[in-house]
Amino acid sequence: NKNSKAIYEKNKFIFADSFKFIRNENILNANGNVEIKDSLKNYIITGENFTYYKENEKIITKGRTEAFLQSKYKITSSDIVFLIKEDNLSSIKKTKIEDNNSQVYFTENFKYSINKEIFKGEKVLIITNYKLPKSDKFFFENAIINLKDQRFIAKDTEIEIHKDIFDNTENDPRIKGVSSEGNENYTVLNKGVFTSCKKNDNCPPWAIQSKTIKHDKIKKTLNYDN
């Protein structure tokens, strides 16, 4: 049970089993069942060891940390840096972001703006319809993604489309491009290459190369622009 509470700003609270205040450095350390709660901006951040640096308005967590944001997103990471005034979360550790639409993001070295609902990350893997049928996978070397409307820009892109998108479950349709952009309805890959040849099979190798390839997620089509 949380038996201590500290108010670090109006409508913002830190709950923990114990606190240690280093007065001469203006630092507050919270230990055990730590929870940051902001009732106005609707987020909760939990973990086991948080250090609040009052002068810099910064909180650094140690170990596994979870953030529940605006009743829409759950972030699981470790060793997070939380810039309070900017409402920004960041970590160089591996991170998982889940939304309410069965979409999951795995990333490293991420930065997330709570207010803008935008995150930047490296080695990003997005899985749509997570643990459900007709799941697609998007790989980005690095990307900037708006979680609110799914708009994104990315470098070094690879998409693995669910097998039966073209009514053939034997296919392994996939697209690669040096960069990409898109939203919840489509993805455009630049200098793209497409193949549906099954991986690790004796399928005759073939591919379509194009200046741009547009993957329409709604119509389930691919359009090429040479």
What are these regions (language model features)?
Residues 1-226:
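Structural signature for solvent-exposed beta-strand/loop edge elements and short helix-capping sites
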